[in-house]
């Protein structure tokens, strides 16, 4: 019921405000985001873009359910802080003081598109794709120019996992987001992602299911074959 949703959300928000909030931002420990591997102290500890977007989505829904103005205030303050600290007019930071291009911006845009205007998202995606786009139709999990970038999957060795490997779930989410922001401008990227994902599901890995990820250098089925 709506009451149960409201109660669960309220409990969750109160806990997050008490234990996981600093200067209005949500703070996570290392390895607590979906990118849960560490190489050379690269572990995403701190204040991360998609986590803030999810918090903003919680505030937005809670206001819609309760009409309690405090949630609208929480939402507006965090949104303002995000625009001030994360957006430099060209790309949206992956974390506070970390402008390393990563595809987590697409999670943020999917979870809370109100963070920026369509024109701002368009510029953000256009600039970020220069560093993340893989010609076969996927996204690298880190800037292709990063010293941590690895173009071939390293299997159970975590080296390439979130530093090169391309994850199909985030590729497809990116296609949905690009389609929403400007389907004409990003038409080629969207179609390439659809084609690559379709080919992987039908002809590679485990037929009818998406594999976990692909190497950055070429379309392949790696990781769990039925993700």
In which residue ranges do the predicted regions lie?
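Extended glycan-interaction surfaces of carbohydrate-active proteins
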Residues: 14-46, 77-166, 194-227
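Aromatic- and glycine-enriched pocket-lining scaffold segments that form the walls
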Residues: 11, 15, 47-66, 71-76, ...
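Conserved small-residue packing positions in alpha-helical repeats and bundles
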Residues: 56, 63, 106-109, 175
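Alpha-solenoid repeat scaffolds
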Residues: 69, 135, 184-185, 204
């Amino acid at each position: 019921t709506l009451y149960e949703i409201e109660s669960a959300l309220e409990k969750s928000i109160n806990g997050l405000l008490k234990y996981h909030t600093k200067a209005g931002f949500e703070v996570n420990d290392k390895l607590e985001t979906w990118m849960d591997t560490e190489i050379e102290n690269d572990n995403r500890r701190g204040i991360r873009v998609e986590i803030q977007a999810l918090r903003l989505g919680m505030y937005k829904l809670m206001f819609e359910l309760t009409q309690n103005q405090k949630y609208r205030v929480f939402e507006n303050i965090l949104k303002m802080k995000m625009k001030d600290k994360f957006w430099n007019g060209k790309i949206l930071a992956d974390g506070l003081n970390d402008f390393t291009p990563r595809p987590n911006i697409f999670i943020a845009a999917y979870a809370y598109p109100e963070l920026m205007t369509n024109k701002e998202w368009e510029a953000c995606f256009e600039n970020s794709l220069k560093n993340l786009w893989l010609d076969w139709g996927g996204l690298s999990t880190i800037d292709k120019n990063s010293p941590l970038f690895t173009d071939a999957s390293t299997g159970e060795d975590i080296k390439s996992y979130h530093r090169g490997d391309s994850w199909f779930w985030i590729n497809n989410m990116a296609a949905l987001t690009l389609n929403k922001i400007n389907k004409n401008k990003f038409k080629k990227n969207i179609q390439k992602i659809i084609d690559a994902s379709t080919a992987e599901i039908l002809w590679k890995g485990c037929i009818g299911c998406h594999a976990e990820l692909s190497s950055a250098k070429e379309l392949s089925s790696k990781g769990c074959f039925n993700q």
